[in-house]
């Protein structure tokens, strides 16, 4: 649908190893990450950009990443996002995590979609995580990983 909306302004590259295609992955992880890349990274750029979706396995872990060539995230906001996500994965009682509650009450400051994805992955896989890399003006990479061997 987004391809129809933005036409040729946004290009997609998807790369998944064969062994990834055989694994069950948490639902609604990649789709909201791609939507975030479009909405927050590329939609305001007149040139559009590229979204690169990648999936691979290393040892007992499955990795999924979504990268964009968009606007990137301002440093202060990036730090808040990272802190919130780390709070989800570091907390045994992630549903009661104070930073996650702050995230839900202040959706404009920090991306609530990323917090929801972190919760979903943490709920399914104890040994999991999420990393966000971004430089303003250079794009963003969001990587989700989880242990599929447990």
Regions found by a protein language model. Name each.
Residues 1-131, 140-143:
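Two-component histidine phosphotransfer core
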Residues 144-150:
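C-terminal beta-strand of the catalytic ATP-binding
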